[in-house]
Amino acid sequence: MAEQQQRAAELRSLLNRAAHAYYVLDAPVMEDTLYDRLYRELQQLEQADPSLLSADSPTQRVGKAPATGFHSVEHRIPLQSLDNAFDHGELKAWHERLLKVLDRADDSPLPLVGELKIDGNALALSYRHGVLERAATRGDGSSGEEITANVRTISSIPLRLQIDDPPEWVEVRGEAFIPDDTFAAINNERAAHGDALFANPRNACAGTLRQLDPKVVAARRLDFFAYTLHLPSDHSNSPECQWDVLAWLEQAGFRVNPNRELCDGLNGIERFCDRWEQQRHQLTYATDGVVVKLNDLRLQDEAGTTQKAPRWAIALKYPAEEAPSKLLKLAVQVGRTGAVTPVAEFEPVALAGTSVSRATLHNADRIAELDLHLGDTVVVRKAGEIIPEVVRVLPELRPTGAVPLELPDHCPECGSNLVRDDSEAATRCINSSCPAILRGGLRHWVSKGALDVDGLGNKLIQQLVERGLVRSIADLYRLDAALLASLERVGEKSAANLVAALEQSKQQPWHRQLYGLGIRHIGEVNAKALAAAYPNSASLAAAEPESIAALHGIGPEISSSLQQWHANPPNQRLLEDLRAVGLSLEANTSELNANSTGEGNSSGALLGKTLVLTGTLPNLSRSDAKTLIEGAGGKVSGSVSKKTDYLVAGEAAGSKLSKAESLGVEILTEAELQKLLST
């Protein structure tokens, strides 16, 4: 038995080293035939004695499919997005903001790291004692889908870190992608089988990662570049700069993009960006820009983050690809607030790997600015290689007698006159019964940030409105399962589930109901502030505009919007209808209790306090903790600074803990936070 254990360990080590040399270093050290023979030997040993199986065995890269799809997991450390710059001017403006945040008055350059921005899919890899424990997609940044079985098939991701005495945990972040030649082979195979082709490698990669069968993932040969990591705060010899982070990742067995550069200040970074803008088409994978990072990790912590992105990094996106096309039509879309958006429809063109045939024109002013005529040849590009836009017209190619384009005078959905307020650029339909406004309002009411009703998608909403079954939000709650089941593509079970979900949504808190009403200028954050100050719709409707405007973060624009909305008779009837079908439109007991210790009570324990969360709390998810803190009048920040009042630290707290200790910030456990909330 001891001999078999030793032999299995030897084989694992040999095969993993060979795989790393082949897939990561691109320097094979073992013949394929020998690799196959040793692989089969290890496989036979493990089959004969399953106790020899280990998580880092190369035979375990392709496992069984998950029984019931993917489940959501919370990231130990959130995956933030990056702010974008689209030219050197915006890059310079970011650099100036960074210098200001760091209070750098001298002229000494800041060392910056330039890394190619891979056009793939972000992954979060969790290692426990050096062994890959979990892999997840970015998701919304706070949580993502757990796809460990699929990620284990990516040969450039080590199943065991190739370092001695690994930390208790390591979080590695990077980008999964499909190389160009692999993508071409995948599409060729799909074409041969009569399957729809993938539009671009990024879409193919995203679809592959969500395959339920890991064998399909393995066959598509995804690749991976690692670009950052997180270690326990007490780990010795942690990297002190981004350049060393990349070296650490390489030493641990990850593939790191070799096309990177440590630059002494902004000028060097600009040269790096210009070079790769010219050379990117020579690469064997897709890249859509350069990521610029402050090299010093201590200064990164000092710079901190906003709610969405780090201040110490930015993505400089390559100039968009452009292509000419013939303008065929001006379409018009009506949104839930009645805003009319003109859309240019043109002959399909290929841009940044996708076929594009439509682009928003935003408003009537943009149509006039471009001087658009039917049949014009227009130049189309993708801003940030994502959003199509018409950038200019080629008037020299304009057909004789071409008719100028302009917005219609009447709503294309209901025929009402369109109006435009002199104070804004938007043209609007002001008919509250307009089907387009109703559809948009229904979609907003059931959206995730509002009442969060599962099972009510766009096509079903379209049916309900077209058949006259729903004429207001309140009508949703008058639907029964039998009626829903009679509609196209709605089964009895789906109908019953939707009725149950609608009934359950009546219990959503008052601030979600307020947000769901879709009042102009009121987002989720403002709705929370208003709901905390006014515990029901009646008190909000009766409030003086000056009192509303005086609330923190509200102001006269929102106050005026609320006053206009409540003065509209159809909206008054809507509130009455919602109460009639069982919506409270008021704060429940738990909300009132939270508000009594929060912004509405000057004695609230966390009123005006700034807290930072780090690590994994034993009982509360990060989102739950944030909700409790905000309910008690506190603010949750993403980074530690001199303005931080408390750091709430859980298991595996990261660098935020050490920074808080160095600044003298008070450290709380979850239990201490709960005690503070209860005072």
From Swiss-Prot:
Q: Which cofactor does it need?
A: Mg(2+); Mn(2+)
Residues that coordinate or bind Zn(2+) = 411, 414, 429, 434
Q: Which InterPro entries does its entry note?
A: BRCT_dom, BRCT_dom_sf, DisA/LigA_HHH, DNA_ligase, DNA_ligase_CS, DNAligase_adenylation, DNAligase_N, NA-bd_OB-fold
Swiss-Prot/TrEMBL keywords: DNA damage, DNA repair, DNA replication, Ligase, Magnesium, Manganese, Metal-binding, NAD, Zinc
For this protein, the record's PROSITE patterns field holds: BRCT, DNA_LIGASE_N2
Q: Name one GO cellular component term.
A: cytosol
Q: What class of enzyme is it?
A: ligase
Transmembrane region(s): none
Binding site residues for NAD(+): 32-36, 81-82, 115, 138, 175, 293, 317
Q: Which PANTHER family match?
A: CHROMOSOME TRANSMISSION FIDELITY FACTOR 18, DNA LIGASE
From the Swiss-Prot or TrEMBL record, give the protein name. Answer: DNA ligase
> Source species, please?
Parasynechococcus marenigrum (strain WH8102)
Highest classification ranks of the organism: Bacteria, Bacillati, Cyanobacteriota, Cyanophyceae, Synechococcales
Tell me what gene encodes this.
ligA
